[in-house]
Amino acid sequence: MVNKFNTKNYDYLIVGAGPFGMIFAYEAAKRGKKSLIVEKRPYIAGNTHTHVEHGITVHDFGAHIFHTDNKEVWDYIRQFAEFNGYQNQVVANYQGTLYNLPFNMNTFYQMWGTKTPDEAQAKIAEQRELALKDLGNRQPRNLEEQAISLIGTDIYEKLIKGYTEKQWGRLATELPAFIIKRLPVRFIYDNNYFNHRYQGIPVGGYTQIFERMLSQSQGLIDVLTDTDFFDHKETLLSEFPRVLYTGMIDQFFDYQFGELEYRSLRFESEVIDSDNYQGNAVINYTDAKTPYTRVMEWRHLDGLADAGKTIITKEYPQEWDRSKEAYYPVNNDKNTRIYKQYAQEARQKHPEIIFGGRLGKYRYFDMDQVFNDAFHTVREEFNVAADFNFAHDDTK
């Protein structure tokens, strides 16, 4: 229960023990401020939560590969864990035929048999020209037209269309063109999915990172798991002068301007008696008929597993409703208008509350962006400049 602690002893209430909330609490503790974190799940780390089973580090909410060009973020996270340098190399399965991702010379050879950049560029230009001719002088009106105008019909039909429609639960002709502003195309033989300088997986998983933040906080962070903020909302808001809220902003305001749209995910995991089920950490299924979007085989992230055992997880996108977890926002014009109403309400009615994170700001963040946004919030809250103390060997 919330009354387990004397709430008068805290400087901050933090709603949500995911990365944003945990970083803020840790940095507040370094500045002598005490925080109470309430988390509805039975554990910390949010969607980055990991656990070890059969010697395999399993990501409980989909594959999280850390990648960034931000050295400050990279140095910061490595205070708490060793990273293994893993680079994601995704394979796409379209009706039983395999292609490398992202789109690069390997993909083009698999698609068309082209062997040189000139041949691949000519093939793409030929297909783009046909697409632009069909459009006439107008701009693409939907995602399908946008994608074909950027990359051509072959790659769109086999590697984009089915995956995207499953991910969003909408036909590509019903999705706005701005979802795909550009497509990464490489005219080199390079399967490294993320084109970032710093990449890797924490050895032992992500949960330990936030456990170490707690252990290093000198008793200035308390966490109540299995505690739903909304069961105690009025009491907590009346007792805490400063709040960091990382949940859904529309839920905080009881959906008074309407529900924002989200996409949800469902995961099915299976232990298999094998040392190697699919030969790769991530395989995307890009056809429309396969109900899941990808299959993860976790042992390939770090090479660690008990002999003869592997664990796979299938990821199924699904419509969100209030009984499901919200994973990512649907940032179309309608939802943007609704979110702006909530953001204005937050500024005017609750200046004492910081709304942060992916759900609090109704914005998709990669992990490094969550860290960077948390740094920005800390700097604003405590009126400091660069004050994140860490040291690393720059050669790593």
Would you name each region that the model predicts?
Residues M1-K8:
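A short, basic/flexible loop-to-alpha-helix module at the beginning of a structural domain
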Residues Y10-I37, V378, F382:
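N-terminal Rossmann-like FAD-binding beta1-loop-alpha1 element of flavoenzymes
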Residues A29-H54:
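Glycine-rich FAD pyrophosphate-binding loop
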Residues R31, T227-Q348:
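Mid-domain catalytic core of redox enzymes
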Residues A45-N47, Y94, N100-L101, Y156, ...:
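Short catalytic/ligand-binding loop motif for oxyanion handling, primarily in non-cytosolic enzymes
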Residues H54-Q127:
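Dinucleotide-binding Rossmann-like beta1-alpha1 core, especially the glycine-rich loop
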Residues Q95-Y99, N106-P241:
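Active-site/ligand-binding neighborhood in enzyme catalytic cores
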Residues E325-K396:
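C-terminal catalytic lobe of FAD-dependent flavoproteins
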